[in-house]
Amino acid sequence: MATSKSGGSSKNGRDSISKRLGVKRSGGQFVKAEEIIVRQRGTKFHKGRNVGLGRDYTLFALSSGKVEFKTLKGKKYVNII
């Protein structure tokens, strides 16, 4: 028979790994074709000229050029110029 009570287990101590989301290339920065510009959940940023949209909503460059961020009618767009 145990002489002392068993210790309680903690309900803390869990954390999910970070998903490394966010803007990867800033405005005015030069990018090559197929470079990732934004990693996001949903369309926080919308695709503009020469920008592709992946199935996980990742924005990537379709051609080489400079990154441009624009806001039109309350929506943020990413273009390559």
Swiss-Prot record:
Residues 1-23 are annotated as: Disordered. GO terms for cellular component: cytosolic large ribosomal subunit. GO terms for molecular function: structural constituent of ribosome. One of its GO terms (biological process) is translation. This is Large ribosomal subunit protein bL27. Keywords: Ribonucleoprotein, Ribosomal protein. SUPFAM superfamilies: Ribosomal L27 protein-like. It comes from the Bacteria. PANTHER family: LARGE RIBOSOMAL SUBUNIT PROTEIN BL27M, RIBOSOMAL PROTEIN L27. Residues 1-11 have a biased composition (Polar residues). Belongs to the bacterial ribosomal protein bL27 family.
